[in-house]
Amino acid sequence: MQQHLYFLGIGGTLMGSLALLAKDLGHTVSGSDAKIYPPMSDLLANADITVQ
């Protein structure tokens, strides 16, 4: 069952990694963070995960 998951603090190592895992499992993923920097910003962008 596909779900839309929204991650707060998605730019961090833990939350970003969980977001990438959820995307790999077929879920729709988006999230937000106050500040996000490479390499996590690049990884999320390459996975087509929307970050606000």
Model-derived features with residue positions:
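N-terminal leader/targeting and accessory segments in enzymes
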Residues: M1-Q52
